[in-house]
Structure formats: structure tokens, C-alpha cells
Amino acid sequence: MNISYVDWLRERVGSRKVFLPFATVVLRDSQDRILLQQRTDFDFWGMPGGVLELDEDWETCARRELSEETGLEVGSLRLVGVYTDPRYDVTYPNGDQVQQFTICFEGAVCGGEMKPDGVESRDQLFLPAEELASYPIPRWYRDMIADALQGGSPSFRSPFALAQTRDQISSVRPFVGPARFSAVGAAFIITREDGHILMLKQAAEGAWRPPAGFCQLGENVAHTAVRVARQETGLRIDPQRILGVYA
């Protein structure tokens, strides 16, 4: 693909709301300050990151976007959390509508020279955590920063869905034909009290797999797990923790 995934997709679907997979980094310097960047397309401040390309994994995307937008390199990355809530939805100045499926990492600067790219970032600065409140930072970035500062297990929001949801596959497939596109979803491990793991046998292939399904526009990924578990198994589940992120 000679153009970026998001440009390719928008050429086909227009400005309609779609899921976009993002990777973002909460970057710290040697003084434990957090990097903020002022975007060129909005007036707010946020953190470096961008859209996952086809055939790219989450960590590679996070490192690439960080380097492209800031000129900086990051060492080892820790998973902060998964941010997919429809209350984080964005409409860009050009009218493009997005439901985020954002994987957030945190790490420390290990090299490079800080320089805004002038394309997505017009200014950058490292700030102590206590000074962040005075900057216009969207809710989703504030949640990521708060989760990074808290530490602990990777974060996710409780199951939530809007009153009306929409199938993401049928929202995109008619416009792209048989071409590959990024469809987001969840696979989950359901265990009994005795530690046994639930597996499902696929009717067509006969292979065994854990319950899994695509997210719907208008729900977060925890709600996807609850909904798909009910549909595929009849069970009600309570999502407990993130095991990993895979692309």
C-alpha cells in the first residue's frame, strides 16, 4: 500500500464513522515529566501516536509514530490500557468521524532529538504531572495519563454501549470490496471456578477456539466481550483483566 491506511480507507468510505486502531505513548523524560504535543488539526494538547498500518503490530506502530511526530526514541514499553469507549469519539475538522480503538503504552526517552514534525504536531514540551491540569487535554488522553500514573495492571473501562450500535463490518465492506481492512474485536478466556477454560468448536472448520467477536460501533471492547459471550455461549461474564493486545 503506497498511501497510508487511513487515507486509503477514507478514499472509499468518506467521512462516515469507522473504527480506527491507534497506538499512543505516554513518554517520560529523565525527570519523570510527561511529553505533551500540540496538534495541528485541533487546538488541544495530547500525546504522540497514530493509526496502525496493515501488517504492523501495536508496539511497532507506537514507536514509529513517536519517532515521526517528535524525533524521539523510547526504550521498553509497558501496556497502560485499551481505550475504545464511544464517549471518546472524535469528529475531525474535515468531518471525518472516528470511534477510537486505542492501545496506550508508556516508556522513557532513550534517544533522538525532539523536534515537532510540523504536520501533526506544532509544539511539544515535557511537563510535571501536577502541571497538566492547566492545559486543554481531551478526556481520553487524561484517562490514559491517569492510568499510567496509577500503574498496575493494564486498564480498560467497564462495559458500555450507546442505545444504538452498528455492525462495523457491514459499515465498511460494501465500500472496500474484498480488500483487507482493520476490523477490531475481542477474544476472551472464560474460566470456571475449577480453572477449566471454555472452548467453542466451530461448525464449519471443526477447530476449537475461545469465544471471540468483532466490536460494534457504539460499544467499548468490554461490552463486546459481554455481548459475544452471551450470544455464543448463553453465559453472563464479568471482564476481569486484559491478557494482551494482538495485531
Whereabouts are the PLM-identified features?
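Conserved hydrophobic/aromatic beta-strand scaffold that supports enzyme active sites
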Residues: V26, L36, C104-E106, F126, ...
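Hydrophobic, helix-prone linear segments
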Residues: M1-Y88, N94, R139-Y141, A187, ...
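Unchanged
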Residues: L52-R78, Y83-W140, C215-D238, A247
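Conserved small-residue-rich
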Residues: S30, Q168-R227, I242
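Hydrophobic "anchor" residues
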Residues: I34, M114, H196-I197
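Residue-level preference for beta-strand/loop junctions
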Residues: F19, Q97-F101, R180-S182, G206
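Acidic, metal-coordinating catalytic segment for phosphate/diphosphate chemistry
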Residues: M1-T24, Q150-A187
